[in-house]
Structure formats: structure tokens, C-alpha cells
From Swiss-Prot:
CDD domains: flavodiiron_proteins_MBL-fold. It is an enzyme of class 1 (oxidoreductase). FMN binds at residues 272-277, 324-327, 359-364. It comes from Methanocaldococcus jannaschii (strain ATCC 43067 / DSM 2661 / JAL-1 / JCM 10045 / NBRC 100440) (Methanococcus jannaschii). Keywords: Electron transport, Flavoprotein, FMN, Iron, Metal-binding, Oxidoreductase, Transport. Residues 266-407 form the Flavodoxin-like domain. This is Coenzyme F420H(2) oxidase. Fe cation 1 binds at residues 87, 89, 155, 174.
């Protein structure tokens, strides 16, 4: 190998991370502010070698460098015998045509739904040898066995997990991932600060997994019934860090899915043109904080939606400050509302409280419209407050008092 070529990272005996570090990406799914990784894994059995997932189109040079390095380390012939494709999405399958071209005799193991998806994405695979798998199916690599577990809609219809039995490693694809990009030799959860890891884990769940929360709980039940839960020693997702403490992330997912992660916390989201709605937002915050409620404030001039929904995930209440423009809500508010519609936060075990407020001219109505939208998104709207132009001291006092009242409702909420 050339000195500058990418190196593999060993994660267990005969198992290597051979993925890609994407230091520069900032807009994949709109929330990769710290970059991301496209994790791929090699499993060396005594007789066969399996490659689990791959990388985004145009990024495969790193992956090939790491794959070659792993083969050299193992002293094995450069030959991939088994290709496992846990998920169709291009950040995990983009190099599949290259891999198939280089190793045309290697069968591609995936779900039945994935076969059609892969052929649609990559017409060059139309004659590839696909092996359709179902939950419980296995492939023997010689001393190492891979077991497949279908996971439809976690998070695409084609998704599946792969479990390396003897090593206790669950290759979970997108589930349990995070959009983080740390150096190749820092692949494990324990290699980075815990608060960074868990914050990224919460953000990933909020933006990708929230609408699937009921399926998450159902899949955990299935894993328990199959007797796999106690066998999992490590979780190797397709983005970010590898979990050597799998129960930490499993519990986090359970708490997110059931609402048990919720704190006495409120998220205030607002935009403003002439700072009237901003003044109201700050007054609401003071009222909430006076009762000991944690407050997170987002100003849509500068803040983006993926950070906002991360904080909504463990909050009990949201407040939306809405300026009126031509008798309609300010456009930036509409953006986040449409995003919330898809995320369906009411599937996470409880309904979060909501308050809408804002300044208006003319006939107004934006506050009521967003209240209606929030109700459709699964929030319990308990108050609306709309006023003309610049708020007076009395009106700001009203905002403060409504914040205090909301704080009391938050404290009364019990999530079982």
C-alpha cells in the first residue's frame, strides 16, 4: 500500500471497519454539521470473507484502501465471497456496482424488497446473483456465522440487520447511528466524549426514527423473543461510532420511543421581523424559567430544523412564535411545521403541550393557523396569544404569566 492510502480499523478478531470518513458533508439529510461516516465492515471467516454494506457513490477510494489493508493484515487472498446489503439507500450501497464488477461471483444477500430497489438504483446489477433472506436465515463463513433479521421500515421497507453470532456483533445499518466524523482509529463509543455521542444519537433518532417509534419497540420485542438481546456485545451501525456498551443506546431508544426521555423542558421556536415576536418569546422564557423549567430557544433566522427537533424529542412542551405576513404565518415557521408533520412526535408515547403566540398587523390569524397545524401534528395546543404590533408592558407580563402557567402543566405531566 502507498503510505497515504486509507487504513482499516480492527474492531474484533477477524472483523474490520473499512468505511469512509466524510469530513466535509454538511447537508446530507440536512443535519450533518459534524460530517459523517459511511461504515462498512469486513468479516473474515476461515473459508469465506463477507463485506457488510459499503459507501456513498464517488467516495469508494477510502473504502478500497481499507479493504486491501485488512486483507494484507489477515494474509488472505484478495477476494470477497459474500456481499451483505442491509439497506438500499445510496450512502450504504453506492459502491455496490464496483464491488459486483470486481467480484461478480459473490452473491448479494438482502431482503426481497431490496432486490428490486437495488436493481432500480443500479441497472448494472440486473444480472447479479441475489440471495433473498428472511429473519433467521444464516450464512456460514467458516467458524463465523451471520444471521439475518428483517427490519422493515427501520428505516426503509428494505432494511435488515445482520448479526455475527460468535462475536455478538449486530450490524444494524442506520439504526443506532449518529452523524459524527472522528478519526479512523477512534471508532468506538468510548473513544469520544459521552455527551457528544449521546447528543448526536438523540439528533439522529429525532430526525430519522421518531415516526417509527412504535416499530422500534416492536423490533425490540422480537429481538428478545429470538433470544438475541443478551447475546449482543457490540452494535456496529452504518454511521458514526460503534457501541461497545449496546444497552446504553438500546435504553436510549426505548426511552425516546416511550416518552420516558422527556424532561421538565420547553422548546421555544420563533421568527421575527421587527422584534415584537422576539420580545414575546423572551417573556415566555422568563415565566417558564421562574418555575424551574429548562428552556431551549431557537431563532429561525439562524437555527435549522434538525437541531430543533432534537430538543423537542426530550421536551414536554413547545412554543411557537409566529409573525404575520399578509395574514399568513411567516414562511420559516411553515418549513418547520411541515417537517413536524412527517416526524409524528405523538408516536413517542405522549402528546407534548403546545402554545402559539405572535405579533400581527391587519386581521392576523397566523397564530391560530399554526395552532391548528400543531394539533394535526399531534401536539396538545393549550394556549394562543396574538397581539397588535409592538407588545406593551402589560402584554409582555401576560406572556410571562402564561409561561408560568405552562410550567405548572409541565410539572404535572406524568409519563409512565
Amino acid at each position: 500500500m502507498k503510505k497515504y492510502e486509507s487504513r482499516r480499523s480492527k474492531i474484533a478478531d477477524g472483523v474490520y471497519w473499512v468505511g469512509v470518513l466524510d469530513w466535509d458533508i454538511r447537508m446530507y439529510h440536512g443535519y450533518t454539521l459534524k460530517g459523517t461516516t459511511y461504515n462498512a465492515y469486513l468479516v473474515f471467516g476461515d473459508e469465506k470473507v463477507a463485506l457488510i454494506d459499503n459507501t456513498y457513490p464517488g467516495t469508494s477510494a477510502q473504502m478500497w484502501g481499507r479493504i486491501k489493508d485488512a486483507f494484507e493484515k489477515e494474509g488472505r487472498e484478495f477476494k470477497i465471497d459474500v456481499i451483505v446489503q442491509n439497506h438500499v439507500e445510496k450512502d450504504h450501497s453506492g459502491a455496490l456496482p464496483e464491488i459486483h464488477k470486481k467480484f461478480p461471483d459473490a452473491p448479494i444477500y438482502c431482503t426481497e424488497v431490496a432486490v428490486e430497489g437495488l436493481k432500480k438504483h443500479y441497472p448494472s446489477l440486473k444480472d447479479a446473483q441475489f440471495k433473498v433472506v428472511h429473519t433467521g436465515d444464516t450464512v456460514d463463513l467458516g467458524g463465523k456465522t451471520l444471521t439475518f433479521l428483517e427490519a422493515p421500515l427501520l428505516h426503509w421497507p428494505d432494511s435488515m440487520f445482520t448479526f455475527y453470532n460468535e462475536g455478538g456483533i449486530l450490524f444494524s445499518n442506520d439504526a443506532f447511528g449518529q452523524h459524527l466524523c472522528f478519526p479512523a482509529h477512534k471508532r468506538f463509543d468510548k473513544d469520544i466524549p459521552e455527551y457528544v455521542l449521546m447528543d448526536a444519537n438523540q439528533k439522529f433518532y429525532a430526525n430519522l426514527i421518531t415516526p417509527l417509534s412504535k416499530l422500534v419497540l416492536k423490533k425490540f420485542e422480537e429481538v428478545i423473543q429470538l433470544g438475541l438481546l443478551e447475546k449482543i456485545k457490540m452494535i456496529a451501525p452504518s454511521h458514526g461510532q460503534i457501541w461497545t456498551d449496546p444497552m446504553k443506546v438500546i435504553k436510549a431508544y426505548q426511552d425516546f420511543a416511550t416518552g420516558k426521555a422527556a424532561k421538565d423542558k420547553a422548546v421555544i421556536v420563533y421568527d421575527t421581523m421587527h422584534y415584537s415576536t422576539q420580545k414575546m418569546a423572551h417573556a415566555f422564557a422568563e415565566g417558564l424559567m421562574s418555575e424551574g423549567i429548562d428552556v431551549v430557544m431557537y431563532f429561525l433566522h439562524y437555527d435549522e430544523r434538525s437541531e430543533i427537533v432534537k430538543d423537542i424529542l426530550d421536551a414536554k412542551a413547545v412554543l411557537f412564535g409566529i409573525p404575520t405576513i399578509y395574514d399568513e404565518p411567516y414562511p420559516s415557521i411553515g418549513d418547520i411545521i411541515y417537517y413536524l408533520r412527517g416526524l409524528k412526535f405523538n408516536r413517542t408515547g405522549f402528546k407534548r403541550l403546545a402554545v402559539t403566540f405572535g405579533s400581527m398587523g391587519g386581521e392576523g390569524g397566523a397564530v391560530a393557523k399554526i395552532a391548528e397545524d400543531l394539533a394535526k401534528c399531534g401536539f396538545e395546543v393549550i394556549n394562543q396569544y396574538e397581539l397588535y404590533y409592538v407588545p406593551t408592558e402589560d402584554e409582555l407580563t401576560n406572556c410571562y404569566n402564561m409561561g408560568k402557567e405552562l410550567a405548572k402543566r409541565i410539572k404535572e405531566m406524568k409519563i409512565e
